[in-house]
From Swiss-Prot:
Keyword Signal included in the entry's annotation: yes
Origin superkingdom: Bacteria
Provenance organism: Gloeobacter violaceus (strain ATCC 29082 / PCC 7421)
Location in the cell: Cell inner membrane
Positions of S-diacylglycerol cysteine lipidation: 19
NCBIfam families: PRK13684.1
Domain topic, free-text comment: A 7-bladed beta-propeller torus, about 55 by 55 Angstroms, with a depth of about 25 Angstroms and a central pore.
SUPFAM superfamilies, per database record: Oligoxyloglucan reducing end-specific cellobiohydrolase
Name of the molecule in the record: Photosystem II assembly lipoprotein Ycf48
One GO term of the biological process aspect: photosynthesis
Amino acid sequence: MGKWSGLGLGLLLLVLAGCGAPPLERDEWKVIPTGLSDKADLLDIAFVDDKNGWAVGSRSTLLRTADGGESWTAVPVKLDSDSRFLSVSFDGKNGWIGGEPKRLLRTVNGGASWTSITLDQRLPGSPLKVYALGADTAEVVLNSGLVIKTVNGGKNWQVVTPASAGGIRSAERVADGSYWVVSTRGGSYLQWKPGDPQWTNYERTSSRRIQAMGFSSGKAGWMINQGGEMQFTANQGETWTPGRSVILNGLSLLDADYTAADKKIWAAGGGGTLIVSADDGQNWKAEEVPGIKGSLLNVEFIGNKGFVLGQNGVLLKYRGAAD
């Protein structure tokens, strides 16, 4: 089915999900053409500066923008095999791309050229998330639950975490250098802080398995569980609210992110679902994006910009400042 089956269902959803949030303008997002085939999914996005940015995805997809995300151009990359690029990160002109199978690319010139970095085959797993942390420094989270780090541009790597977190499905690095990850089956989530002798494991508090989790630049955080359920924290994960279903259309949520200053949180998922809360998840409103039927996979607010990435090359851009 489409995102919502008409205005009546949309209004019903708003009533059921709770009222009281500020009215949602129907044009808060716009569709940006990417020219991608129906088989390519967009999975992550990052910017070099205010104008220049990169988006990555399946089928070795690499897109570049030079106008702040208003238009995108595909950039061919020569690889020995097709790759699924899962993550991209920049610190100035220094950037990294990570993905499957065991794929890692590096640039030192804002993406004008990319170099393939070979990882030791003895390292278990493939890059799930990459974090550019300086001219030659980066950290990479492997889907086996290990975090590795380089300080010389990828020539050498050291294992940062004392042990593996086990297979993981999502990972988030916060400002103090600690990591939060979700186990592959979603039965638990784990935290590691620099200096900790091991990962700290937390069992889920909901009967529903965890899909993903993330944090704002402050102490606010979100957790998505199966079936469109969400939980929230205001103290960087020390405590979480009880699970609460925020969508009632039978579709799952897959990702979320806070706007600047944590004033709103947007969540996205299956069937083009895109919802927003301005009161810490108590009430939600739905954004209708005509023609979007596939899953929306990633929500990213970067400075004053916002983007949603999805299946079949879908790319949405937030209208106006992400306040």
